[in-house]
Amino acid sequence: MRYSEGGFFNAIMSFPQDYPNNPPTVRFTTDMWHPNVYPDGRVCISILHTPGDDPNGYEKASERWSPVHTVETIMISIISMLSSPNDESPANIDAAKEWREDRDGFKKHVKKIVRKSID
């Protein structure tokens, strides 16, 4: 289910001074409607959480940031997240609720954002 397929979504990846010891942050600068993207565009996936950081209390240390990760592994994780949302620990509660309860409504919402991204 790739509802966002065909869209062009701009994002900023910011690297801390102590990279690769700490993860970069990723924030979409275009509109997004996704359970794992905060309303302000910040991406919430395990690979971007520091080893000691477990904001939701469910992540294994092996799922979080490690200096062996690269920009490529981050991008692959984000692409995977876009097609397979994790609604167990949502960053956007409303998007997660719609994803769970009204899949057709979610699809329409995302398709509208995809159309907007290519205009």
Label the model's feature ranges:
Residues 13-17, 30-32:
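Short glycine-rich, polar/acidic loop-and-turn segments at beta strand-coil junctions
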Residues 1-10, 17-19:
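N-terminal onset of structured domains
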Residues 11-13, 78:
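Short, well-ordered beta-strand segments enriched in hydrophobic/aromatic residues
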Residues 23-119:
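Domain-scale recognition of soluble eukaryotic interaction modules
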